[in-house]
């Protein structure tokens, strides 16, 4: 009960009175392949080049520098996602992630005679084809606060072009990583912690409701030289959404994932993402990497998603 009250208070103090439900959906589309293959767990996984998005505090662990290019098709190709992730720096790491979301060939219709009612002689016809485009840029910075405690921040900017409307958005996420011991880690990400704004050119604006991500992971080797990463994650929102667990405006969904590395250049991944199963594989050769993830269709029949990426580390 005390934990529930603490979570509610933490979210409430960051929510403005004008917050808009679903305004932050574009920021919820994750980059990367490996974390997606693990059921969308990634707040404690440092092996991904998109780690700065999942939890910017991971950058304080000095991960390898590199670049990743990803292509994803959501809902059996209805929405495309293109992404570039970059981690640079020597002693101090910085991440940059560029995410592009697109829904193309959206057909707009109107009646042949707009002044008359719908009938067999006055049918809808396609008069225009449009597309929806989102361009989102994330940065990530981190520092070590104590021996086992790390803090990170991820500012973000976005440009939205939806049909004949366009707008801009800006905000930031706040991440934390606590190394409980040599094997267990706790990751926290307070997304949109200072009221991310979406400003439309027509004069309207939306405020993104903050949400809280919590993840607990455990790393071990059941067999010598075969590392295993286990993680469970919870998304906690105050938007009165339908979710796995609901109580008033508070809702929570859950994720779980596993990564097994039988040999140094092969990683096998699987997970559970709310109501879907995920799986994937990561293959590396010297500094080159190739990753693939699959997410099966949900109960809403929105179709499956596939991701593939190539990477280079130095």
Name every feature range the model reports, one short phrase each.
Residues 4-14:
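Sec-dependent N-terminal signal peptides
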């Amino acid at each position: 009960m005390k934990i529930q009250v603490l979570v509610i208070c933490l979210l409430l103090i960051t929510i403005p009175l004008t917050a808009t439900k679903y305004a932050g959906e574009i920021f919820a589309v994750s980059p990367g392949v490996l974390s997606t293959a693990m059921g969308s767990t990634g707040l404690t996984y440092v092996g991904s080049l998109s780690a700065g998005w999942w939890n910017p505090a991971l950058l304080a662990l000095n991960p390898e520098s590199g670049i990743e290019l990803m292509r994803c098709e959501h809902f059996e190709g209805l929405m495309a996602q293109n992404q570039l992730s970059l981690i640079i720096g020597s002693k101090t790491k910085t991440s940059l992630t560029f995410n592009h979301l697109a829904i193309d060939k959206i057909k707009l219709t109107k009646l042949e005679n707009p002044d008359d009612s719908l009938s067999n002689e006055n049918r809808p016809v396609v008069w225009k084809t449009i597309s929806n485009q989102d361009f989102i840029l994330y940065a990530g910075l981190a520092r070590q606060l104590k021996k086992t405690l790390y803090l990170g921040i991820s500012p973000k900017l976005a440009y939205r072009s939806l049909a004949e409307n366009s707008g801009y958005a800006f905000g930031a996420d706040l991440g934390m990583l606590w190394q409980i011991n040599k094997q267990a880690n706790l990751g926290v990400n307070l997304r949109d912690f200072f009221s991310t704004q979406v400003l439309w050119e027509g004069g309207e604006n939306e405020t993104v409701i903050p949400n809280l991500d919590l993840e607990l992971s455990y790393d071990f080797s059941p067999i010598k030289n075969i590392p295993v990463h286990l993680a469970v994650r919870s998304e906690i929102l105050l938007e009165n959404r339908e979710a796995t667990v609901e109580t008033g405006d508070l809702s929570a969904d859950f994720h779980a994932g596993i990564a097994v590395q039988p040999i140094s250049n092969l990683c096998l991944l699987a997970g559970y993402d709310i109501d879907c199963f995920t799986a994937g594989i990561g293959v590396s050769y010297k500094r080159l990497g190739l990753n693939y993830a699959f997410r099966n269709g949900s109960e809403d029949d929105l179709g499956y998603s596939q991701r593939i990426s190539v990477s280079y580390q130095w």
